[in-house]
Swiss-Prot record:
Disruption phenotype: Gene knockdown results in decreased overall survival and growth retardation. Mutant fishes have pathological liver features, including swollen hepatocytes, steatosis, fibrosis, and hepatocyte apoptosis. It holds the Pfam family DUF3730. One of its GO terms (cellular component) is cytosol. It comes from Danio rerio. This is Focadhesin. InterPro entries: ARM-type_fold, FOCAD/RST1_DUF3730, Focadhesin/RST1, Focadhesin_C. Required for the maintenance of SKIC2 and SKIC3 proteostatic levels in the liver. May be involved in the regulation of RNA degradation by the exosome complex. Its main location: other. Residues 733-760 are annotated as: Disordered. Coiled coil: none annotated. It is found in: Cell junction, Focal adhesion; Cytoplasm, Cytosol.
Amino acid sequence: MTETLKARLEFPNSLIQAQAVRTLVAAVLKEKGQNEKICQTSTKGPALESLWEQCSSDSTVVRSACCNALVLLVEQGHADLPYVLNTTLNLLPSARNVQGLIKVVGRLLQIQAGQRENRASFTCPYSIRSFPHPYITVLENRPDCWPALLQEIDDFLQLATDKDEPVFVEMLVPFLRYLYCEPQRLSENALLRQSLLRVLLQPREAPESDRLEEKGASSTRVVRELIRSLFDLLPHMLVDSVTAVVELSSFAESLTAALISHPELWRKELTRLALQLLCACQLTIHLGGELMSLLHTLHHIIPAHAEELPAEQVIMGISLLLLNASVSQQTALLDLAVKIVPPELPPPWGASLLVMPLLHVLSCSSLMEALTDTQTHTKNQKLANSLLQTVQREPARRKEDSMQLDLPLSTWYSELQVAVSVLHRVSTDSTSSSEWLYSLQSSLSVCENVPDTVCLLVSHLIFRSDGDLCRLALETAAAIAEADPAKVPCLLPVLMFKLSRVSDPALSLSVLYTLPKLGTHKLCIPQVLHVLQTVGSSSRLRPVALRLLALLWKKQDRVYPDLQRLMCQLDKSSVVMGKDTQWEQILARAACVRDICRERPYQHGGDMLAAIRDTLLQFSRKDQATPVALALQALQELCRAEVVDICSTWKALSPKLLSDTRPLVLKATAELLALVPDLNVKTEEYEKFGSEAVGVLWGYALSQDSVVASQGFKALSEYPESSHTILHLPEQARPIPKQPEVEDEVKQNEEENEEEEDISVPGASYVKLVSLTSLSVLPALETFLTALVRQEMKQMPRGVYHSALTGGNLRSDQGKTVSGIPSFMLKMYEKNKQPGLKPGLAAGLLLCYDLPVQTDKDGRPIIRFLVSRGRSYQQMLATFIHEVNIQPSEWHRSLLLPQAWRGFMSRAFHALLQGRKAELEMLQKQGKESPEELQYQQHYAWLWVRDRLTDVVKSAAKDSPVVQGNSILALSGLAVVLTRYESNLPAQSESGPEAGPDIFPTVHWLSMVIDTLLSIVSSNSNPKAQVFPWFVHRSYSGENTASVIARSCAALGLALLVPVLVTWRRDSIPSILGTLEAGLPGSATADESQALQFHSGLALGMFLAWLLDERVSDISGQSVAELLMKHLKRLEVCCFDPNLEYNAGCVLGVGLVLSSLSSSSQCERDRVHVSHTLDRLLQSLQDSSNNSRMMQEVVAYSVACVGVSAFSAGIIEASKAEESMNTLRALTEESQQTPGFALALGQTVFGLSSFGHGKAVDIQPRLLAAWTKILLAEGCPTMQRLSALNGLIALVGSETALIQMKSECEETSLQHSRLNEVIRAITQIITFSGTIGLQSNGACLLGHLHLTHASSRHSRTAVPQDFGYLSESSVIRASVDFITEAGRKGPEFTAPQRVKTLLSALAAVGADFQYPPVNWSSVLSPLMRLGFGEEVQHYCLELAASQTQSSQSASLFLGVWLVPPLVHSLSLRTRAHLYESLSCWMKHVAEDKLQVYVDSLAVQQFEPLTRLQRLSLCLSILHGLSRAMTAPNPPQNCWSVLCSTAEKIYNLLPDSIPAAEVALYEAMCSCLSEMSDAEIDRIVKVSEANVEKTAFILSYLVSKGRVPLLGLNDVISTILQVGSKRPISWLLLQGLHQSRFASGPNTGVSKRMEWLLELMGHIRNVAYGSPSVKCVDVLQGTDFLLGVFAAAVVSWADHGGPLLVGIRARWFPWPQSAELCHGLYANPEDTELPVASCLLAIPYSIRKLLDKEPWKSQSQKFIDWLFSITEAPKQAFSETAVLTAKAALMALRSSSEFKKKTVWTRAYGW
């Protein structure tokens, strides 16, 4: 610039300066050239530089001219507009004066706005961030230039108005968005914001318009665009401070004024603005600002637009604001409410929400009257009362709210929407209301701050509902008060208001009794107390008020003076009242005294003593017992707390109480005396008092009044047993005094009685009370007996358990007699000098020979005696082989010999094995053998024993036929023993010594035994291997030369080998059966020998019977049942063929097979067959007069076998069994010298009596006496004595080892005494009788008796048969004896209710204790089989189940009843109990029984047709399974059964959850939760069909923290593939919410956050079509997934959201209710509504979620994810979903991440 030009520009004359500028512009044009354009890339000359410099000149003329020149250059095309604009903006930060530059910017923007073509739509080229608006740049770089900018914008808008160009406004929009919506809200821009608002909305006219119409039109277009632009800014404005509230208020006020100028044009906008202002009001209250300006603005909007407003939202909003507003603010809000709820029209639907706020306003108004302006107070009162009257009227019909805010100012609007949606839900029907209230109650326990919206909804339900729903709402209100006491002042007026409107007395009482429950905080007490005092001001309501005040006092002790005052008012009241009212006051006062003494006896009990005394003395009439009883209850509490001394109290009151006869008073007195044991003091005086109390209570217990008697027994149950004496008992229950036999004893007893008389009560006397007590008192007596049994078990010495099992405490004559038989027989054998007696003694000794093990002083066996004991057995083996006689004609001996030899060989094998190991131990100590050799010999000692015993048999085998027969049976017995021993050996370990060449393998040895026996029996046998060559049985021609006895014994030996064959040669069984069948009478291949035919039939029967015992299902692919029936039919053909001569063995065989079939088969066909064949046998017996004696005997014996077994198995009735018994009895009486008849009769009577057959029980003692007399009578014929001997032996159970009875058939103590009596009689015969035949048979039968009692499957002497070893004072002993006797006599003699009383007592204690050893099956079996009823059966099995842990007999007994057919006779209640107690007994019963009862029968109950009828049983099954699976360390077999059963039941449960079967699914979850994760994944596989079932199961397990949240992913994926189903989202919602409360690693906050982020990624993948995701309908899928996301966010954000929505804190928050039509969903049709509410709550909840750690750190990820929804393809998300995402983004605008410009501009779409 030249100095001349510079001087001109600085010359202070405008003309000169203008010329200078003109010259400068000419210079610029000259510099640029003719066709060039000034732009960024052109050369910048000095003239242009000067021009730019002068644009910021201090001279207004120069500056203005230069700026105009720049704009002119652009307009004329000499300069590039972007270049000029950018250069201007660059100069601004450093410019001395910015007015001109800002003018340039404005002119350039005008040029840009005017460049559009022919009215084409205009889009502003600028934004906020990417291409920032020039004004934004100006403001950010020079904030101080806002006045110039304001002036320029004013000019800009005026120009727009003049030119009628609304696009000019569009050009300003980015700047306006930045200025008003920028989240930082810079304070330096505040003045600009306020000033610009006035500029923007000031009236503008177009002065150059020629006509008025054109003038109005032009101004309207620009102003309308301005108003719309400003209105669009409102939702995006951040209000986070009081300053922001003020600005917003001003903004809204100005905008409202503009909108109201044309209300018809802006109807929707005004409605939305009203809702936004409502949100602004809430923000203002929250921030502590002033509402009046906003409310003033609302008042301008609402009158004209009340119809368009969503009434429920506005009412809800006003209600919430009223609860938190000040008195002055309440006035404006009430005015607002009146406009929404005008008094002249029906109130809008939902207006009752205002009830609680209005009552709150009235309460505040009353309290604040003195501090409030009179006018304001009056107006508030008037408005509130008017509104209260209006909202009580019937509301108008609900209108659908069409108007909703998509982007509200505050997330509070989201809460409003949720609350309104819940209001709609709970208003549809009572089911939805109840479900929401129950859900609310379940969640209140974890919530400290209850949202006001929840209180509004509850108060609405209280106000609008009646009956049960109202009561439920009242309960919920009380729960709210407990959780958040701050809500009490609002709830209390609602209750009082409801009380004033209720006409139902019951509901009024419910409301009244809710009032004290609101006293949950000391600051709430005055308000509640005032209400109760108001109620008490009425004399008729005073009793109720007293009870209410007492309830309040229980919660808050501070109201005790008021309670006392009201009680005193009752005493001193002078008001005349009716008798009923007076009586109510008396009762209320007495009840309060009782409650005070019960609740806080230490603090206030002393104050009540006078009242108690007065009550006891004042009310003595019969109709005044109630207050006395209440006073005694109060006294009881004081004594319990030891406020008063019970002993002194009794002394003072006993004269009056003992003379009282009123049942209610006596009952209360008994309750008082029940405390005596607990308050025991060790003084003589107290002991006397205790004795007196016991006497009084026994007097009550024996009262004729059932109430008094019952309470007497209950009180006595608190006393120790030692307190009772026989003097307390009635005469009938006292023990009968023992009569001494001689005079000396009388004198001695008198002397002892003088010293001390024993007046303790025997247990039997207590039990006698059961028979003497009336049925109505039996439950109380049961309590008393239970207490006695429990005391006895607690004091039971430990030693009893051991000594009972070892016999140390057995009665002197019990057990020892049987165990003394072997020593007696050995002694007789050694002393015997009569050759004729030797075989009988040898046979008897074979059956019972057993040498005791000699021990040292420490109880350890003496080694050398073990060695000699083994040698003794070897010697006796050789002796028995030679001396035991075998007579084929003695059929009973043939039955005994196989078992005799098996038993002896077992004892010999184990004795010799002990001896061998002892011998090797001695050698080891002596060091005579190497350790390796000794180890080898020790390892194979059992094979050494086998070979040693085999050598003994070998050395004797070549002798006579009898010796050969014994050798064969001994060899067979050894094979059986060897097989059983080897099967119990542990598996051969690799480290064990290998067998040397001297060891003959067991399998080969056993094969030799089998083949040897087959070769002896049949000539056609072809041995597979070598045989023992000791028996010469084949001639050179191949004929069988073995003796008849040897062949007969070999046949029996084959039957004995059944266990061996089943283990080693199962495929040989059919051929062996064929071999034995070939020897049957009538067969073409049968031998001519009578003995061989007999033994073939007997051996075949034994074989089949023992094969049944092995429980084998199939042999070589053939069913054992088919094989059995095939050969049984052949045996029966021979048995019943009258033309066969030697078929006695077949008859015995049939009897043995049918006996075994009775006990083992559960097939109805088999049971029918047994019954039918028994009839045929009985008929044969009755028609057998022409048969041989032997044939008659074996038929009788078979009838006895089958009859007893069939009766024990329930196949035949008692009448049929009695017919058999009578037939045998008649035959025995006719032929008294036939031993077989007596044997059969004795066996029948014993068997039937063991199972409770009454007639058999009666006959047994008479037969015993008669036969004993005959046996001991030397003058009787020998055969008659022999018959008596056989009958006696059978009468005490000798044959139970031969026949099959159910395993619970056990002897009783009475049978033991009979057994001992018989043994003594027989030993007397053997010792002293001169009849050798009788002695010989007696010796054999005595040994048989010992074998029977020593070798049964469960030894009858293993445990005592009763509790006789306990003292006579034992109640347990007496109870069991009573039960046993009842089982003998049957229900005809003992009432089932009385049996149940004792059983129930034993079962109750048995659940906690294991009783001392006793044979439970012998005790309980008769009760089960006789008609005592289902209840007795139930307690029998309950008792047995509880004792299985320590009692094998209980386990066996229980096992019999767990399988068909008996299990089907049990009641459903009993079966349910067995399932529920499964964990107690599952380890102790046989595996097959457990398998049947649990894995088979339990699963059957879940079949569709059965399950519906037996839901309770099914539930018990699942509960039992769950408990059993919870048990620590269950055995593997049990665990397998439990898991298998649970899986099968799971598969049978319906895929859709039925309404009444929800509990089954919950119980199934408990079972699954005990399994491993892998098992759960395998069983719970999600499919389209079972998606509802699996969704519930997995949601439930997730809610308990059992499986991770990832377990829900399969459900979600399945829904995406098959389409959404209604209840699934709801199920996931509950599971996600409840998982928050689960403890464990699976549902911790980090796991939940990880899962939610993964879900968000999954939603993104579905929306954007990721190939890894399968989804049939993207839009439907994303809606479902967003629902799941909303469920998680609402559930985990805070506790208020779930509370409002009604999400449950537990799955089943309500009791069983007929109102709720579904056990899980309550109302299946509404399951989507809570999820929809969650979607509405996303903006509200997501903000709360991301405000806390660790979620806060993930805010950016949530924001990015929300962007992925708002910017997703249109087909990916519904419009609602996109709006929800935008609202959620807006909710986060307070976060630091959102305030980044890149984020908020993107979120706003700018």
